[in-house]
Design a protein with these regions (language model features):
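ASCE RecA-like P-loop NTPase motor cores
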Residues: 1-168
Length: 168
């Protein structure tokens, strides 16, 4: 990948971008180029960082950028925003929730394995209130085929993490 990053790394603008980012630690906006160039610039500028967050205007652009980003970083993922249109949320609710949980799972795995990850989302995806990652970690339940499960303990654990018990 250095073949793709080296020409950009020598540009004064990229060097200034890296320096500004290291000094301030603040988010950086890249504009004035097409989306595929933005992905190339992002990966060249922040290649040394393990966690990268790219925020874009709409879902279609975010998904397209995620596909482009996979060329530079195989662990690039798209974090979908919560669907605020109730009809659409009802139809796609489980699919979106599943995608978001898979994304959180990959972030936790990257953090545990000390690997790089690039998360691409929309501004609406940033509005979503999430629990801290440690709370997700603390509430992961593992089962083996040979386990004997105490249903009352399992029920109390599930209720404790937010599930609702309903009569069958």
């Amino acid at each position: 990948m250095k073949t793709f990053y080296a020409p950009l790394s020598e540009l004064a603008g990229i060097e200034q971008l890296k320096k500004d980012f290291e000094v301030t630690g603040q988010p950086v906006m890249i504009s004035g180029c097409i989306d595929t160039q933005k992905i190339h610039l992002v990966h060249a500028a922040v290649n040394d960082y393990r966690f990268r967050l790219i925020i874009t205007g709409d879902e279609a652009k975010a998904r397209e950028m995620q596909e482009d980003s996979r060329f530079f970083d195989k662990s690039s993922i798209y974090y979908p925003a919560k669907d605020f249109i109730f009809y659409s949320a009802d139809v796609h609710g489980n699919q979106l929730a599943g995608e978001r949980l898979r994304c959180i799972q990959k972030i936790i795995a990257a953090q545990d394995n000390k690997t790089n990850i690039t998360v691409i989302t929309t501004i609406d995806g940033c509005v979503d209130m999430l629990m801290p990652l440690q709370r997700y970690r603390d509430n992961i339940i593992h089962f083996k085929n040979s386990d004997i499960i105490d249903t009352e303990k399992l029920i109390s654990k599930l209720v404790g993490i937010g599930y609702t018990r309903v009569p069958m």
